[in-house]
């Protein structure tokens, strides 16, 4: 075999290697980001001391399910917005249904509760810190997701930044569930959502500058 033929064959083989898909990129970004958020939570907040008992409570899993569904919906939005011309018809439903479901549970809880208990169900004991802590834990996830998104082709940078921030906030909220003692549906439906919307708002601001072609 001639040297020129060998070089041509090797070049053709190298060109056949496919770049990672968008789903693979984001899976890796979420994995690394979630690991960073978990380490941050363990270093600064620690796992709640009664986690074993909390795992037996249905409302704990409702809380985890809510933020996990929002993370899945946000990932769907991120994948759609990373492709030029991709349809986003189902994005509002993917993001809105988990929120509406939690708000329905929260409304039922408040209606059934005694008037004196409603304030505690909404504010809990950690309303001042909860949104800020979720936003703090979202930083590693947000950085990883935003880095992956920059390598793709979002054509609506502000909306893409919002979706990236919401995904980061939702993944951070899943991690925060291991620390947070709150189980009231009204608390989760408002303060958790606020914590996830903080990085989403930051994503809107950063998207126009960092994700523009």
Swiss-Prot record:
Transmembrane domains' residue ranges: 27-47, 51-71, 91-111, 126-146, 159-179, 187-207
Pfam families xref list: NrsF (PF06532)
Induction trigger: Part of the SigF regulon, induced by chlorite (HClO(2)) under control of SigF. Part of the probable sigF-nrsF operon.
Location in or out of the cell: Cell inner membrane
Role: Probably an anti-sigma factor for extracytoplasmic function (ECF) sigma factor sigma-F (SigF), which responds to (hypo)chlorite. ECF sigma factors are held in an inactive form by a cognate anti-sigma factor.
A single Gene Ontology CC term: plasma membrane
UniProt topology in membrane: Multi-pass membrane protein
Main localization of the protein described in the UniProt heading: membrane
InterPro entries tied to this protein: NrsF
Organism: Azospira oryzae (strain ATCC BAA-33 / DSM 13638 / PS) (Dechlorosoma suillum)
Effects seen without this gene: Growth not inhibited by chlorite during aerobic growth, slight reduction in lag-phase when grown on minimal medium with lactate and chlorite. Up-regulation of the SigF regulon (Dsui_0156 to Dsui_0159).
Keywords from the UniProt entry: Cell inner membrane, Cell membrane, Membrane, Stress response, Transcription, Transcription regulation, Transmembrane, Transmembrane helix
Family stated for the protein in its record: Belongs to the NrsF anti-sigma-F factor family.
Gene this chain is encoded by: nrsf
Name recorded for this polypeptide: Probable anti-sigma-F factor NrsF
